[in-house]
């Protein structure tokens, strides 16, 4: 967003003008324990735990580059410890997956029909793809993600939400009430819809 880009420029200006000792990191989409249930992955997991069909914006072909929060944290520490002052490092785990595939992976991991989800009206201006190239972080600072396979990180996340209902339960009803006011279940899009492998046709 423009505000995030603006903050990066401010940090660069402070480093150059006032000698502030700072680095900048930009990350891809996080997932993992303790993420608010309004977010895409925990919302779908907790819906399934509640016996509610997951909700997918539009055709679900929007791609996100997912990184487990533990890997994001170790990336940040690597930058703090060894990064060059004033430089920007991108933190990503090569986890590009489209949204419909994420939902199907969640359903399969939880022993459900991978097609047991609802399409809802798409978000306005829904970005098609986010991606991060973390080559610099890996080559210069020697960082590597622990969760190289998205599904293994996803399973660990599912296990956490199963075991910690007392953490997410108090915020679930209010979150779903807000979504219910804006989301409408629609038929699966015909043109550009996705098949079981997440491919468009």
Where are these regions (language model features)?
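Active-site pre-Tyr helix/loop in NAD(P)-dependent dehydrogenases
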Residues: 8, 27-34, 62-63, 82, ...
């Amino acid at each position: 967003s423009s505000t995030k880009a603006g903050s990066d420029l401010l940090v660069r200006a402070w480093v150059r003008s006032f000698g502030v000792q700072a680095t900048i990191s930009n990350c891809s989409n996080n997932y993992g324990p303790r993420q608010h249930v309004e977010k895409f992955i925990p919302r779908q997991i907790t819906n399934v735990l509640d016996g509610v069909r997951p909700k997918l914006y539009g055709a679900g072909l929007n791609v996100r580059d997912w990184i487990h929060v533990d890997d994001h944290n170790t990336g940040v520490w690597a930058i703090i410890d060894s990064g060059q002052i004033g430089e920007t490092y991108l933190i990503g785990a090569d986890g590009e997956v489209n949204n419909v595939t994420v939902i199907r992976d969640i359903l399969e991991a939880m022993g459900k029909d991978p097609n047991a989800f609802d399409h809802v009206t798409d978000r306005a201006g829904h970005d098609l793809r986010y991606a991060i190239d973390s080559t610099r972080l890996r080559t210069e600072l020697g960082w590597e993600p622990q969760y190289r396979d998205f599904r293994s990180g996803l399973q660990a996340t599912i296990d956490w939400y199963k075991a910690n209902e007392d953490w997410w339960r108090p915020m679930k009803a209010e979150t779903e009430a807000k979504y219910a006011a804006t989301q409408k279940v629609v038929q699966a899009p015909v043109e550009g819809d996705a098949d079981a492998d997440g491919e468009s046709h």
